[in-house]
Amino acid sequence: MTQTAGRTAWYVERFDEFVRSLNGSSSARLLTQRKEAMDAFVELGFPTARDEEWRYTSLATLLRQDFGVVEKLGEEVLSDVDAWRVPNLQSHVLVFIDGQYQPALSGGASLPEGVRVSNLASLLHRDGEVRDGTSLAPRGKDAFVELNTAFLRDGVHVHVDKGVRVDVPIEVLFVAASPNAAVHPRLSVRVEDGAEATLVERYVSASDHVHLTNSLAEFSLGESAHLDHYRVQDENRAAFHIANLYVREERHSVLRSTCCTLGGGLTRNHVHTHLMGEGVDSTLNGLYLVEGQQHVDNHTLIEHAQPHCQSHEFYKGILADDSTGVFRGQILVHQAAQKTDAYQANRNLLLSDRAEINTKPQLEIYADDVKCSHGATIGQLDEDAIFYLRSRGIGSAAARQVLTRAFAGEVVERIRLEPLRVQLEDSVGKRLEQAIANRA
């Protein structure tokens, strides 16, 4: 039996234990969905290097781990959650520790009428299903999506009514605390016609223990809706992090999504945006900063299905030490999507001769009246620029820090939420300072 097949069987056993632990709290309809998802997972199995989309990312280390479900949380974690909040950010926050919602630690700024924010478990127990956005992720295609459905316990549900403008950011904080814990959170977001909202997702670790986060987010934007979305992953170096995001945009909607990956030992981010109406404006920004033996894999698919839409994708990576990275970005333009304006760029900075990046931007175009461009760069710091700064009295390490911070700053400065931007500038600066010091 192969390692992949063996671990598939192991997860089936854990699923049977999980279902028994629910003690009938899962509705019949949801239980059926769970079992169908597990059947699909068994059929799919874990991806391997033979799968083109996983060609450069091995799951061997993940498959050697025995993950479990946390039943009880430590008091020390519950008392220290403020340490992971964004300083000076006035938000309405939902806090989850090891996948469990913490109402006593949640709340904050009040939300206007027409906005419903809750943890998913409360809806699942009441209705047995969540109706907004749950059909966006394709079924039977991705093993981790199926695992998320099979082991789903909690997550976040956001619904913004038509025409409502939410000035207060909605912040979701996921804290991983227990060793060998596996959590499978779900985010379901619906922004109705003409509504506006800002969502901040943050993932952190409270210890150095191995753990797994396998998240699935589904966002649905109505006509002329606006959503600013920020996702920051800063878990520990022993963490495994799998993230899937599926977005559906109706006509004239605007999405600005920024994904920052700073932590995790092995991280896989997959984003699929589907531009389903005319005049959609979709932006994907990304920054990944990895060092040591970290591995980060970013896959994006922007699908243009209707005319007169524009998309802008800008991902930058900084890789130090023995770290590795993958970027595979695809823009798919259907025949009906005339007058598409699409731009994609992936730029990478290697701070070590041992660091490695595999980048593959792609255009797949079936319309003849479009303006599409893409490109990728891989390089090191400009020695002429370093020499110039040193000639002005700046030390070698400081000069390298100035240049690398400027490189990362092209993404960070696009964050429109000032407290989050300031925090990331500080976090990125400290990481780069350490990475450059290790290089010396």
Segments (PLM) and residue ranges:
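Conserved beta-strand/loop scaffold segments within soluble protein domains that form the structured core
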Residues: 123-127, 132-394, 408-440
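Short, low-to-moderate order helix/coil transition modules at the start of elongated helical scaffolds
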Residues: 1-216, 223-226
